[in-house]
């Protein structure tokens, strides 16, 4: 998108839960790290048009009795801090939510039997399950979501430029190639 806009991109690696504060403080112009649109985030940042579909899924061990989201009440659930999985997990009745800085840390806790399930974005979940033979993703998604780029609230100039770039990339087919390569790659 930055290339399409004719701008230089500087990537800053930071914890997921610090992305919105970084945008608000001006430390970052935008966040495009698997950020999904939800009501809480819309209070603090503006979002571009959607560039890909997403979902929060549930990872369990292959021998787990958990078969659907309905089985999560009362369980120990691992989430990555600041993600929508983190936000939604708080709504699960009597669940003990354990927060981790990285999704891989939650998966490690699941493998060690410290938690019963992990709620995380579908695409990283596929990678974690592929790399951890004893795990599986439940067929039923926990939530369906949309990926978009977050920008500072009220920065309509940047938002409009990004939306125009996303539109051009969609129309040319280039956006789908990027999504296939970086987001939905198996």
Residue ranges and their predicted role:
Residues 52-60, 122, 126-167, 183-186:
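Periplasmic-binding protein-like
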Residues 1-34:
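Extracytoplasmic small-molecule ligand-binding "clamshell" domains
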Residues 1, 23-24, 72, 110-111, ...:
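Hydrophobic residues within well-ordered alpha-helices
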Residues 10-23, 64, 81-84, 98-112, ...:
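Short helix-initiation/N-cap motifs at beta->coil->alpha
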Residues 25, 29-30, 116-117, 136, ...:
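Short, Asp-centered acidic motifs that coordinate Mg2+ and/or phosphate
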Residues 35-43, 88-90, 111, 116-143:
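A ligand-binding cleft/hinge motif common to bilobed small-molecule-binding domains
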Residues 84-101, 133-141, 161-186:
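Ligand-binding clefts/hinges and TM-proximal coupling segments of bilobed small-molecule sensing domains
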Residues 60-77:
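Flexible hinge/capping segments at coil-to-helix
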